[in-house]
Amino acid sequence: MKKFSSKTIKAKNSVKMTALSTRAIAANLILQVLDEGKSLSALIPEVQLSVKAQDLPLLQEICFGVCRVLPRLEQIIKRLVDKPLKGKTRIVHCLLLVGLYQLLYMRVPAHAAVDEVVNATKSLKSDSFRGLVNAVLRRFLREQDEILAIIDKNWQTLHPEWFVNKLKKAYPNWREIIEANNQKPPMWLRVNSQKNALETYRTLLEEQGVSSKTSHHPNALCLDIPIAVQKLPHFEEGAVTVQDLSAQWAATLLEPKNEEWILDACAAPGGKTTHILELAPQANVIALDVESHRLKRVEENLERLNQQAIVVCGDASKPDEWLAEIGKSAAKFDRILLDAPCSATGVIRRHPDIKWLRKETDIAQLVELQKKILSALWEKLKPNGVLLYATCSVLPEENCEQIQAFLNAHADAELLSLPFSDDKSAVGFQFIPQPNSGDGFYYAKLLKRAS
């Protein structure tokens, strides 16, 4: 099989987003994920103004798709290009990833996909690569069956080895988690019970030709086919919120009551804050997050649902600082929702770039941060108050092991049972990602005993 050489070709990989094609922008974003450790969730909003509205779904599909199946695409390139495209030529490597993803996974005519990617070399100031890109993609089309037979001979996880090893240790059904992660996520809605009954809103969807199914959660609907949020009936009026099924249990398990003081720690982007206020509209809610720019999303969601909360920028591990700033130094809370900073390994199917951004060394640091926040907020919980600990992780060290260590260190902490857990010996409850169901999520509900 012929390989193509890149050894005599040079290109720049620093390009402006203006006037770039969608494929060129996708290659640039993928480059920033792989080489600079940036997340697609942060990058895509930054370039939305540079992309036509009708092309934004294409950009998202390419970027998230490439990250989802990255190892497979990398192996194909390795078989077709004899020398790695490094340094200033990395942008062309990412452009090949874009082209191969389209050829393998998208309903784009092969000739059109190749032509678009080849033409993108010019706007990326890599026109000297035009011939290489064209030759690699066209040879792949000719020899696709042979190449894939070799690459796919062994079962591929499409995940980093360190993560697979952790799953094998923790879960007998670890392959199910891997397979769910490699699929596109379902679109779940949370129906605002202050506006509509679940079946009433489901009927509104059906009237627009949108089919859905219910679940074991009283406010959740799963769309059979995802649609743009702008097409959801009465979305702007706050009738519905896009939120994963597993995440919808947070406010439900917290059981907020009107007039209570409730802290939503690590609140951005505000899905759980608004759900708390749907369940208890007269509750006094503080929505806290350490990143000020992410709190803008909280404020936007509160405004859309016509709700009120105290939105605070502060470090959850240092509550005395931000409580003093808002004039509530002596305040203690009836309930605390701690959706702790975590590895996000339970939401890989929604954010496949996590597979390549997260490092094994991150886990110990996150565990220590969770421990610090948990202990600090426990001091701000009233006697007989409830703290709900949550993560979107599937790793035991962040979840059941973290909570067991906390229980061992705090005699006033009592683990409460959860309605969907039959195992009385379990420390909290772990959702794993499943097709047509929720993401990976962990919950533990703690009562602070009165002394």
Swiss-Prot record:
Residues reported in the UniProt entry to bind S-adenosyl-L-methionine: C266, A267, A268, P269, G270, G271, K272, D289, D315, D339
Pfam hit, one: NusB
One cellular component term from this protein's GO annotations in UniProt: cytosol
Reactions catalysed, as given in the entry: cytidine(967) in 16S rRNA + S-adenosyl-L-methionine = 5-methylcytidine(967) in 16S rRNA + S-adenosyl-L-homocysteine + H(+)
GO molecular function, one term: RNA binding
Active site: C392
BP term (GO), one: rRNA base methylation
EC number: 2.1.1.176
PROSITE patterns recorded: NOL1_NOP2_SUN, SAM_MT_RSMB_NOP
Domain of life according to the entry: Bacteria
Main location: cytoplasm
InterPro entries, A to Z: MeTrfase_RsmB-F_NOP2_cat (IPR049560), MeTrfase_RsmB-F_NOP2_dom (IPR001678), NusB-like_sf (IPR035926), NusB_RsmB_TIM44 (IPR006027), RCMT (IPR023267), rRNA_ssu_MeTfrase_B (IPR004573), RsmB-like_ferredoxin (IPR054728), RsmB-like_N (IPR048019)
Compartment(s) of residence: Cytoplasm
Keywords: Cytoplasm, Methyltransferase, Ribosome biogenesis, RNA-binding, rRNA processing, S-adenosyl-L-methionine, Transferase
Sequence similarity: Belongs to the class I-like SAM-binding methyltransferase superfamily. RsmB/NOP family.
Function: Specifically methylates the cytosine at position 967 (m5C967) of 16S rRNA.
NCBIfam families to which the protein is assigned, alphabetical: PRK10901.1, PRK14902.1, rsmB
UniProt protein name: Ribosomal RNA small subunit methyltransferase B
UniProt source species: Haemophilus influenzae (strain ATCC 51907 / DSM 11121 / KW20 / Rd)
Name of the gene encoding the protein in the UniProt record: rsmB
